[in-house]
A protein has these predicted regions:
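Acidic two-metal-ion nuclease catalytic site recognized across multiple nuclease folds
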Residues: 114-138
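Short, conserved catalytic/metal-binding motifs centered on acidic residues
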Residues: 23-26, 105, 109
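Phosphate/oxyanion-binding active-site loops and adjacent basic polyanion-contact surfaces
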Residues: 3-7, 102-108
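Residue-level detector of alpha-helical recognition elements and their boundaries
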Residues: 38, 77, 98, 124-125
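Mg2+-dependent endonuclease catalytic cores in nucleic-acid-processing enzymes, primarily RNase H-like
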Residues: 1-92
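Amphipathic alpha-helical interaction/assembly segments
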Residues: 93-96, 107-113
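Active-site-proximal flexible loops/turns
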Residues: 33-34, 112-115
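Short, solvent-exposed helix-loop connector elements
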Residues: 90-102
Length: 138
């Protein structure tokens, strides 16, 4: 378990090394402190609160990306494992609720990445390592 300062330092390294324009961070719970620290260090961070509606929207988008073959996962065992434990149910108000019996850190990171590249009026190219690029996009 990393502390917020260590995580912020790692994010700062990645912003520098990969020339990232914006880092999307789950602001729910402890992530709020990470957002504050990142902003203090001039890291281009944007917080996303994982409300029921927001999380449902991001996971609907991910489902559409998979269905339309816009995203592929290869050789990412932990990601596939965690995705396989996701379930959905609906609240009395009809809002979809995404749940997992296991950790969902990898899938949550994936939906944040998908949200990041599709935000705004244009798509952005993500410069990632060849291994991760091949694993995510084939």
């Amino acid at each position: 378990q990393s502390n917020v300062v260590d995580v912020c330092g790692k994010i700062n390294e990645m912003v520098r090394d990969y020339k990232l324009e914006t880092v999307f961070i789950d602001e729910t719970g402890l992530g709020g402190g990470l957002i504050d620290l990142a902003r203090e260090q001039d890291i281009p961070a944007r917080g996303v609160v994982f409300s029921l509606q927001e999380k449902a929207s991001m996971y609907k988008n991910l489902r559409l990306l998979f269905e339309n073959h816009k995203i592929t996962l290869k050789k990412v065992d932990k990601m596939v494992y965690q995705l396989s434990y996701l379930t959905r149910e609906y609240t009395e108000g009809g809002v979809m609720k995404i749940k997992s019996e296991e950790h969902d850190d990898y899938p949550d990171s994936l939906v944040l990445a998908c949200r990041a590249v599709s935000s705004g009026n244009q798509w952005h190219v993500i410069d990632v390592g060849k291994g991760l690029q091949k694993a995510l996009f084939g």
